[in-house]
Amino acid sequence: MTPLPVVLAHALPELILAGGVLLLILIGAIRGKDSDGPMTELAVGLLGIAILTLVLGTKTQAVLFDGSFIDDAFGRFMKVLVLIGSLVSLIMGQTYLAREKIDKFEFPILILLSTLGMLMLISATGLIALYLGLELMSLALYVIAAFHRDDVKASEAGLKYFVLGALSSGMLLYGASLIYGFAGTVNFTGIATALHGETSLGVVFGLVFLTAGLAFKMSTVPFHMWTPDVYEGAPTPVTAFFASAPKLAAIAITMRIMITAFAGIKPQWQQIIVFISILSMALGSFAAIGQTNIKRLMAYSSIGHMGFALVGLAAGTETGIQGVLAYMAIYLVMTLGTFAAILSMRVNGVNVEQISDLAGLARTRGSMAFFLAIMMFSLAGIPPLAGFFAKWYVFNAAIQAHLYPLAVIGVLCSTVGAYYYLRIVKVMYFDDPAPAFDRPTPTLAAVLIVTGLAVLLLCVYPGSFVEATTVAARSLF
């Protein structure tokens, strides 16, 4: 049994969120509707405390709970990103949810529950812990997707996500059972030992199903079909959350399981990851070109970006993992900044989502147009912004691993994808002005400015960031 001081030292963020959820449920049950506003503030406070415990807490590595949970530099890095994504999504959505009269006290609780599942998922070192974390994350997401019950599109989005999510969970569970049957253990290190020097066809089949289940959570091709409809139909703060935190958790556990459990069959899983990466980059680049709704465009953009991130994982090296970590951190900043701008798209108190509504924004809301243009240039990978260095990291790792065709395809897809990002900049700066947007709330303006500055300054002062990704990647090997 793990001693209590060790548990407190290495699983404190999870304990804070778990205890906080119970406390918030109790407050909500007692105070009812009167607790709607304070609940969000309390949830933000809990997420902030969890971030501080990770940043300021112990830096040693420990395995807890009979080998099913690990606290290492890799996990801490990804957990900080997930918590930041959840915290900013909650902050950005508070005014929107109140305006739409859906600011129920259950919303921040569901965000916290989903985030707790993500933290468990990132630290999982066994198939059972992986499945428990994944389901805790997913069950809350199903409800959040359909949180706007009076909106038909939101209800449709929630139903689609639930049905396809249940299918993907079944595939993952079937893959886990195959792996357990052929390896004789559910622990990642035990699986690696069982596969040492031997390749079992049954394990490879299990890995395919396991990867399919995780690919659904990452919204990569061919398990992406839910993404555009859910992103468009769900409330915009929910879409911002979907586009950030769950993807980080899913790609984190994918990296952990491939590097630690299946290192012995790297050529086999490398082919799977390369296949998913190429399809995701291609679809994300080409399918977004014809989109007119900016939330659907961001859905295809996220599919493409996950494909680019998987280029680093396909390399299967420490440099590749470092590239993925850097890519996901930069992707998080760009995504949150873009959704802060999307949430600010309101005309006479009504939300608008069409790209044409951004016409002439530079003349009506110049500062908003400037920072949104920075996000678009960075998402397109234009140097010297952070998005360029994100892609450079993963393509460099692919070249070092002699995956030249993958790197070339990635560069070509990035070039094609730049078109629809630059089209938004063109609409904002060169088209005749559409009706002016309402003044953004101070919170959304602050998020847009901070993320914009981060994208600009990351290329100037990369030292601490690169060092953090290096330490995190090294701890996985």
Curated annotation (Swiss-Prot):
It comes from the Bacteria. One of its GO terms (biological process) is ATP synthesis coupled electron transport. GO terms for molecular function: NADH dehydrogenase (ubiquinone) activity; NADH:ubiquinone reductase (non-electrogenic) activity; quinone binding. It is found in: Cell inner membrane. Keywords: Cell inner membrane, Cell membrane, Membrane, NAD, Quinone, Translocase, Transmembrane, Transmembrane helix, Transport, Ubiquinone. NDH-1 is composed of 14 different subunits. Subunits NuoA, H, J, K, L, M, N constitute the membrane sector of the complex. Belongs to the complex I subunit 2 family. This is NADH-quinone oxidoreductase subunit N. It comes from Beijerinckia indica subsp. indica (strain ATCC 9039 / DSM 1715 / NCIMB 8712).
